[in-house]
C-alpha cells in the first residue's frame, strides 16, 4: 500500500498590521471524498505568530484503482473573537507537497480580505500569501 498524502505539512506566520498574533487558534480540516473521511487538527501560534502542522497521510488498497483524488482542505484562524479563512483548496493528487509543488509556507495577514491565489491545479482561497 502506498502512502497517500491528504494534506501536506504546513508552516506559517500570522500577523495583524505587521504585529505577530500570539495565541491564535489554527484549525486544519479535510474531507477525503474517496472514503468520505473527515479529520481535523489544531495548533496555537507562538509569541512570534508562528505555527506548524504535520502532514496528514493514509494508506489504502482502494487508491490503487482508477479514480480522481479529491481532498477538500481548509485552514481556519481564530483570533480576537473573529474567524478567518486562511486556506480553502481542493487537492487532486496524493503527492507530498502536491498542493503547490513546493512546501506550504503561509504568511497570513489578518487585516486583508480573502482572495484566490494560483496553486498547482486550481486556486487557494484565503487571507494567506503563499511563500
Residue ranges and their predicted role:
Residues 2-4, 35, 63-131:
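Feature of secretome-associated and extracellular-like proteins
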Residues 39-59:
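Glycine-centered loop-to-beta-strand initiation motif
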Residues 13-21:
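Structural motif
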Residues 16, 28-32, 79:
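Residue-level signal for short segments within beta-strands and strand-turn junctions
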Residues 25-42:
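Short amphipathic beta-strand segments in non-cytosolic proteins
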Residues 8-10:
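Structural beta-strand segments of beta-rich domains
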Residues 22-23, 28-29, 58-60:
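A short acidic/small-residue loop/turn micro-motif
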